[in-house]
Amino acid sequence: MAQAAAVAKPPAPPRRRRASATPRRLPYLLIAPAALLMLGFIAYPVISVFYYSLQEYNPTKPWRNGFAGLDNFVHAFTEDPLFWDTLVFSAKWVFVEVGLQLLFGLALALIVNQTFVGRALGRALVFSPWAVSGVLTSAIWVLLYNSQTGITRYLADVGIGSYGTSWLSDTSTVFPAAVVADLWRGVPFFAILILADLQSVSKDLYEAAEVDGASRIKQFWHITLPHLKDAIVLSTLLRAVWEFNNVDLLYTLTGGGPAGETTTLPLYIANTSVDAHNFGYASALTTVAFVILLFCSMVYLRLSKFGGEDK
């Protein structure tokens, strides 16, 4: 009977092996080397800047090198008028450039969004300046502003201005001249992003608005503009950060001159470190710029709903 009971006992279920954690960890292991490398490229310069901002470090005067505490920051905020001048000009440059680029970019996007013959070619020509580097843009506009062979001579031929006028050497004209040069390259950025958003607006909305008797202006104000709001806000903040860091175009176009009229804070930092070899003070100025850009980045991430929040 015991034997029969033993035979009737159901077999034990097969033991399952624990799933290996390796497949789940494999993606993280694969990206770990690249992530650590990128972290090193980002973290090391940031830490070095913070460290040297507390030092007096000038390779040409090694006997003066040493710990300076907050002296560099105190000097910047209380004793260096150039710091405040460049900071104010940076704000002016960002405000004017981003504002004009947004307005012209919006108008350009609305134009190329229409149906017309040769639209594809027109879009390619309109967007092509965005692919040009800042240095090459400066080279183009330096030639255009040349007092002997540029547009100033042709304007003088028709009675506008005088011969021999150099817009990049005159304190009264250098700012608008630099603004126009950067507009040529920056406007397509807004036009591309806004055009991409324009093409996602349903045509049914415009047809319904026309049936209701809404004018083109009302359609733009109540349909187009609300739809573009998020794209405009985020692209404006992103472009503001880029314009604040615009060194290549201004450096090659004006060099910060004349008389420091077009020197932004990043350009002042470059001159302080490269020309004056005052790396300690330049690091302190870089820290200030880092805090400003960090604040702008936090605003950008907050408005873009960073972290998976629903729009």
Segments from the language model and where they lie:
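Short, Lys/Arg-rich, polar N-terminal cytosolic tail immediately upstream
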Residues: 1-22
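A structural signal for multi-pass alpha-helical bundles of membrane permease subunits
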Residues: 23-311
